[in-house]
Amino acid sequence: FDNKVLLKADPGYLASLNALSLVEKERLLRGNWKIRPAAGLYFKRDMFRIVHDLPDKIVSVARAWDLAATTITPNRPDPDRTASCLMARLRNGQYIILDVQRRALNASDVRALMVNTAMADRAQYKNVQTVIPQDPGQAGKDQAASLASLLAGFRVSTHTVTGSKITRAEPFAAQVQHGAAMVMAGAWNQAFFDELEGFPDALHDDQVDAASDAFKAVARSHDWTALIS
């Protein structure tokens, strides 16, 4: 990058470019406009550090949901799943994925899972924000409002789903690529890493969507008054 005029006008511009995800950095910093999104360019499992305990105190924590209401049937052996990602921002500025769920459930069971999960999250991490996606249109608004009502008494926010899945994932991917993300060891790790490494070419991206939205929530959240360990 040799635009000296721009660097003089904005000395922080180069640092901002270096903080982008690999694909965007290749385009804007190195002028490589031939690069295309492909599996392995956003996430690799060796970019994450797997830990067994929290390395620092939690500043903000959220569980984001990616919703589906599909069950496994002979005609649909591998449907989209309802997925959720519990992520926290730590006092040291890093991020940790604490838990990921991925289930093929009907609508009634999805609602029960959301309530039970919110109760378990609050018991373990106290002030957890539950993030519900809102699809465009009236049906999306009605579903989000219904789920928010179902979770009355919990800290709930809704967000309208906009932009491509790649655009939504890039801020999280940038932090992962710069070594700022950890994963709590768990039985769900393998399936999570498999899906992330296949993004955006893989058949399913439910966990990627949930993780991207959870990252957005904790990255923007105000710090807690009281930190928890």
Set out the residue ranges of the language-model regions.
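Generic detector of well-ordered alpha-helical packing
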Residues: 67, 134-136, 206-210
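Charged alpha-helix within mobile-element recombinases
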Residues: 195-219
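Acidic two-metal-ion nuclease catalytic site recognized across multiple nuclease folds
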Residues: 215-229
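G-domain G4 guanine-recognition motif of GTPases
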Residues: 1-4, 134
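ATPase catalytic-site recognition across NTP-hydrolyzing enzymes
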Residues: 3-74
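Short, flexible loop/turn motifs enriched in small residues
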Residues: 75-83
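A residue-level signal for conserved active-site and pocket-lining positions in enzyme catalytic cores
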Residues: 29, 172, 210
